[in-house]
Amino acid sequence: MNKFILIPLVTLNILFGSAAFSQKPVASFQDWGVYSSNDPKLCWLASTAMKVENTRGGKPAMNVTRGDIVLFITYLPEKDILGEVSFGGGYPFKPNQMVELQIGSAKYDLIPEGGFAWPANSDIDTKIRVSMTRGSTATIKAESTRGTKTKDTFSLRGFTAALKDTKKRCGV
């Protein structure tokens, strides 16, 4: 398995496997929540989509079932994960088709694996985080294994403050 897939899967296993994701935020900054857990030390900020659009054949799709739609930034210092960007779309993504993240005029490809997607490397993570501190919204476009096209929009209000708080909590 590729390193760019293995590390995010380890992170998500910790987040979801430990029920850490279901906990309440330790801090909130407008549209972003900050979370942390110990053993191992794990800190992340997350936001849910403020607008969700689902289409099939170019028309609005009404009967679409999706799980949680979340944009994350994760810090797991023990595994040298320092600001990893990830997106949970609430459904399995179409294999071998990039997920597109747009912040302002900047566009980034995210690599899908099951129902999650990540940038290919930490350099792209850094570029995305910088764009997020400067932008007002982040829009993610993807397609499900069933052919449903989705467009999820996230507010970036409070992102910069939440990012600073998360890094402080994780000592990075």
Can you describe what each PLM-predicted range is?
Residues 1-4:
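Positively charged n-region of N-terminal signal peptides that target proteins for export
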Residues 7-16:
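Bacterial N-terminal signal peptides
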Residues 21-172:
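A generic "folded-domain core" signal
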